[in-house]
């Protein structure tokens, strides 16, 4: 998948994790003593053939940077293989992204300079393994602007619905509506 770059957003709301995320990002939380939450997204991207991955950080990302290092564990240590994208202090940005859209806007230069035509954008707080190859093929075949991967009827445990996003889709799978935080 030469024409695809990966982008992992690590600025999720961590309010339910309290002390666990007081000094580290959700993406840097340990899993089974050896892995971190972000390992699943990085591995899924690399196993899908994605060779250029940007990690958008928000706060408490020191341990995340220590864990990821140069990206060698995922064979992303070459030129443009793995890029950390912290919130830089600028006129428009006070050093913290206000959300995903602000993070994307702040990193437009990085996105424009990439050689890839497509972007796989994911968060870092969901643990799963996935091969994105079929999803990208589907996206290209449909000529879609955006393709959303979702689980039908899934609900995150312990979220009490405050940040859930519900999609309405037609019989062809096209999104016809969206409700956030109901």
Name each model-derived stretch:
Residues 1-182:
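Unchanged
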């Amino acid at each position: 998948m030469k024409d695809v770059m990966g982008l992992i957003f690590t600025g999720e709301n961590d309010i339910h994790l309290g002390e666990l995320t007081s000094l580290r990002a959700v993406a840097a939380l340990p899993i089974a003593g050896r892995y971190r939450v972000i390992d699943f997204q990085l591995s899924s991207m690399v196993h899908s053939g994605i060779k250029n991955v940007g990690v958008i950080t928000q706060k408490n990302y020191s341990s995340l940077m220590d864990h990821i290092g140069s990206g060698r564990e995922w064979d992303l240590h070459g030129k443009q293989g793995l890029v950390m994208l912290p919130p830089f202090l600028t006129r428009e940005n006070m050093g913290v992204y206000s959300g995903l859209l602000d993070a994307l806007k702040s990193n437009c230069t990085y996105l424009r300079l990439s050689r890839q035509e497509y972007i796989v954008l994911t968060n870092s707080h969901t643990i799963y393994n996935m091969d994105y190859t079929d999803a990208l093929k589907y996206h290209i075949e449909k000529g879609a602007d955006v393709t959303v991967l979702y689980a039908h009827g899934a609900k995150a445990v312990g979220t009490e619905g405050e940040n859930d996003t519900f999609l309405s889709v037609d019989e062809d799978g096209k999104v016809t509506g969206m409700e956030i935080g109901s």
